Regions:
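Catalytic-domain carbohydrate-binding cleft regions of carbohydrate-active enzymes
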Residues: 2-156, 163
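Histidine (H) residue identity feature
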Residues: 31, 45, 74, 176, ...
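N-terminal start-of-chain detector that recognizes signal peptides
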Residues: 56, 79-84, 93-95, 133, ...
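Hydrophobic residues embedded in beta-strands of well-ordered beta-sheets
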Residues: 108, 120, 167, 227-230, ...
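Solvent-exposed beta-hairpin/edge-strand motifs
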Residues: 125-139, 248-267
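Solvent-exposed beta-strand/loop surfaces of large extracellular or lumenal domains
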Residues: 135-155, 260-292
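Generic detector of short, aliphatic-rich beta-strand segments that form the cores of beta-sheets
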Residues: 159-162, 294
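Accessory, solvent-exposed terminal regions and/or long lumenal/extracellular loops of proteins
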Residues: 162-264, 273, 285-286
Length: 294
């Protein structure tokens, strides 16, 4: 019930922040009972609709991860997002934390909830593995766990931090209706500092055919080390709509010497434009400190 189920419509900033939080919820719906033209719809906030659209578009982008987490919740009851103290139980500093949460296992969400806020303090929980780090989702800046960082924010901001070991599948093609559209270009963000795995789940999204095996579970496993190894293992008979895959691997140290797929070296591009034009290959972004593979 984004915006409130009944009562007066919220002011624009509050509505934007409400949407920015709601996009990570299992059920996301903007509606109310009002019939007197005070119903909370995005187009009622003409000066804020850009930020509302950006947030909703981001939820669509995250839909491969969201759907996979929903299937996991169905199987074992683990919520798609949890308070930080549930994930980092050995860090007492998280016990009083009541706003930030983990979306899945590896994405820390720190929504802006104070009116007019320009700086958002974010506590990055301590981890048991000393090799783990947190990375700003947007800039890829690296942070050690167990500290509070100050994040500059504006009305468009949704502060996010990627935890070491993250495997976050996203849609590389724009989506607007999941009943009629599918992810055809799969983008996977990884932070391969530590060993990790994530199971991407797909089915037709409409029927119960998955009960008869019409699903596809793709286990994506990362083996960290001097040589990073990523493996994909499939289970199920559902035919995926994915036609292309793009890996974005946070690699802070330096560019790798080579990248192989099934034992065959991919071409290395020094210029991003040529990489974007190529059908396959890899490129190292100095700005983002990441290896980009397709």
């Amino acid at each position: 019930d984004i915006g409130g189920f009944f009562g007066p419509a919220p002011e624009g900033e509050l509505f934007v922040r409400w949407v920015q939080n709601g996009i990570f919820q299992p059920r996301f719906s903007i509606h109310s009972t009002n019939t007197d033209n005070t119903v909370t719809e995005p187009w009622m906030y003409s000066d804020k609709k850009q930020y509302i659209k950006e947030a909703i578009d981001f939820r669509y982008k995250l839909s491969p991860t969201l759907y996979s987490l929903m299937e996991r919740a169905h199987e074992n009851g683990l919520p798609i997002w949890q308070p930080t103290f549930a994930v980092f139980q050995n860090d007492p500093a998280t016990y009083d934390e009541g706003v930030d949460f983990m979306f899945g296992d590896s994405l820390l969400v720190a929504n802006v909830v104070e009116k007019g806020q320009t700086v958002r303090p974010v506590y990055l929980p301590k981890t048991e593995n000393e090799n783990e780090r947190f990375y700003d989702f947007y800039t890829r800046e690296e942070y050690a766990p167990g500290q509070t960082v100050e994040v500059p924010v504006d009305i468009a901001s949704i502060p996010l931090f990627v935890r070491s070991g993250a495997i976050i599948p996203m849609s590389g093609n724009a989506l607007h209706n999941l009943m009629t559209e599918k992810t055809t270009a799969l983008d996977i963000l990884m932070a391969p500092d530590v060993d990790s795995a994530f199971t991407l789940y797909e089915d037709d999204g409409r029927t119960n055919d998955y009960r008869n095996g019409a699903y596809l579970k793709t286990k994506i496993a990362v083996k960290a080390g001097v040589k990073t190894v990523v493996t994909f293992t499939n289970e199920g008979s559902y035919e995926t709509a994915v036609e292309s895959m793009y890996l974005d691997m946070i690699h802070r140290e330096k560019s790798p010497f080579y990248v192989q797929v099934d034992g065959k070296e991919l071409p290395h591009f020094l210029h991003r434009r040529k990489f974007e034009q190529a059908e396959s290959g890899w490129y190292y972004s100095q700005r983002l400190k990441s290896v980009q593979i397709k």
